[in-house]
Amino acid sequence: EQCGRQAGGKLCPNNLCCSQYGWCGSSDDYCSPSKNCQSNCKGGG
């Protein structure tokens, strides 16, 4: 895990989104609030 609650609240570098599973990425699977994105989400989540 790289980010979010699984990584002690870390944020992703380069404004990447943090997925519900604690990984950084830029696709909808990482960024969509409906997929429980944790940080830097699309839609201001």
From Swiss-Prot:
Domain of life: Eukaryota
Key words, A-Z: Chitin-binding, Disulfide bond
Intrachain disulfide bonds: C3-C18, C12-C24, C17-C31, C37-C41
A single MF term (Gene Ontology): chitin binding
Classification via SUPFAM superfamilies: Plant lectins/antimicrobial peptides
InterPro entries referenced in this protein's UniProt entry, alphabetically: Chitin-bd_1, Chitin-binding_1_CS, Endochitinase-like_sf
Domain Chitin-binding type-1 span(s) in chain numbering: 1-43
Family annotation (PANTHER family): CHITIN-BINDING LECTIN 1 (PTHR47849), LECTIN (PTHR47849:SF8)
Role description: N-acetyl-D-glucosamine / N-acetyl-D-neuraminic acid binding lectin. Can inhibit fungal growth.
Protein name: Pseudo-hevein
